[in-house]
Amino acid sequence: MLLKSLFPSILAATSFVSSVAAEDLPAIEIVGNKFFYSNNGSQFYIKGIAYQQNNLDSNESFVDPLANPEHCKRDIPYLEAVDTNVIRVYALDTSQDHTECMQMLQDAGIYVIADLSQPDESINRDDPSWDLDLFERYTSVVDLFHNYTNILGFFAGNEVTNKKSNTDASAFVKAAIRDTKAYIKSKGYRSIPVGYSANDDSAIRVSLADYFACGDEDEAADFFGINMYEWCGDSSYKASGYESATNDYKNLGIPIFFSEYGCNEVRPRKFTEVATLFGDQMTPVWSGGIVYMYFEEENNYGLVSIKDNTVSTLKDYSYYSSEIKDIHPSSAKASAESASSISRTTCPTNTNNWEASTNLPPTPDKEVCECMSASLKCVVDDKVDSDDYSDLFSYICAKIDCDGINANGTTGEYGAYSPCHSKDKLSFVMNLYYEQNKESKSACDFGGSASLQSAKTASSCSAYLSSAGSSGLGTVSGTVRTDTSQSTSDSGSGSSSSSSSSSSSSSSGSSGSKSAASIVSVNLLTKIATIGISIVVGFGLITM
């Protein structure tokens, strides 16, 4: 009876050990302007599909595509069937668990490029900022996904600058890239690439790519995606504009790929551009592309339709399948590419079409902002709704100089407190107004929206406040803090781990590494299985 009850447990344990011990996908690395597998140095081309369903039936602002294992189980076979090796996801809910979907994707050999923003937390092209709220959002996604080796990279922005009148917004996205890369490094995570996804505006596209690729490695984008919809119906390399784009980007210096493609002006889409994209004319410059998109919706870009949780492939799916399965791109080796003549891109000069400063916004620093807030006498009252902040800003900044909280991506001039939370910035200008009105009690009221507090300045804050100056027009060099994001429930490993993001940084310093918890689990279960098998052998039920 003992052996009967023990034997299934032994088999289960050994099966689980086999599952946990399975190799993670090798991380994808960058050398020159190409992607390579980290384990063997062979070139990696993106054969991707955008995978995010619009929110139709929920009060939430978006649907997390990797938080529903049943949907992943339903869809991944259809992704596999068309040789998909990358999906792009546009918004992730950091309060959800993604372990099962990420594991299923890994088992299918599929990598993920994830946008760091979400609809309610992104850089606004019309009023751009890079502040603590966004920094905490971006780093929370990094914390959640850093230890999955099938995370290929992150997008810090998508079509933020989309025409010549808002090129200043790119300075804020580039600051986001800089600080996200610094955060990854400071946490000891593996080196995950961070890039940008642009639209295809002929007036700015070359300057846009050059801007993100130029400068010091610490602040430059690691890769560049372009949402390309020029090839419609039966076109050609020249007629589609692909030839022109390839010439435009041939010296970019970082990997470039189509972060979206698949014009639907002619349907069904036959995807005749696939052979060209992965052909010899384009592969020296381009690293593949991501078809837009998996789900059929009102915009008519889908490869499949889903009704009552049942997948039906569309004609586009069949055409894409036949094209993507027939590609044979040439393959470079990382060892040869390292000796390439491709060098760092030169930053674009300011013109009528391009006005983004190479002087980037300061790093959001929670400690600096907290020091400033504590030093104030007049602050916004806690009962004031954040929706009312804009009216208060408008009123105050019409009466005093608010440059200490403002940021200008064209001139490259940024107030010392421009990266702070809105509440802290509002308190700062309220206090300025109060001081400029000789600290009259009525000057700290604003219709009951402000109140007085006892100002405090800790010794550790003196240097910050001195550098910023009383008006906030000085310069404070913010520091990337590693304690801003909350712990999450995801395992953070391609091969299930029980450690949270807050405790796993030391176990993920190299590509493809298992988390400490996974290693412990494997070792423990191996010992259990070994003991169990020894017992069975000892009873003579198995001969060795």
UniProtKB/Swiss-Prot annotation:
The keyword Glycoprotein applies. It is found in: Cell membrane. Pfam families: Glyco_hydro_72 (PF03198), X8 (PF07983). A lipid is attached at residue 515 (GPI-anchor amidated serine). Its main location: membrane. It is a lipid-anchor; GPI-anchor. Gene3D superfamilies: 1.20.58.1040, Glycosidases. Glycans are attached at residues 40, 59, 147, 408. Residues 516-544 form a propeptide. One of its GO terms (biological process) is fungal-type cell wall (1->3)-beta-D-glucan biosynthetic process. InterPro entries: Glucanosyltransferase (IPR004886), Glycoside_hydrolase_SF (IPR017853), X8 (IPR012946). GO terms for cellular component: cell surface; extracellular vesicle; fungal-type cell wall; hyphal cell wall; plasma membrane; side of membrane; yeast-form cell wall. SUPFAM superfamilies: (Trans)glycosidases. Keywords: Cell membrane, Disulfide bond, Glycoprotein, GPI-anchor, Lipoprotein, Membrane, Signal. Residues 1-22 form the signal peptide. One of its GO terms (molecular function) is glucanosyltransferase activity. The keyword Zinc does not apply. Disulfide bonds join 72-101, 214-347, 232-263, 369-420, 378-444, 397-402. It comes from the Eukaryota. Residues 469-514 are annotated as: Disordered. Belongs to the glycosyl hydrolase 72 family. Required for apical cell growth and plays an essential role in morphogenesis. May be integral to the pathogenic ability of the organism. This is pH-responsive protein 2.
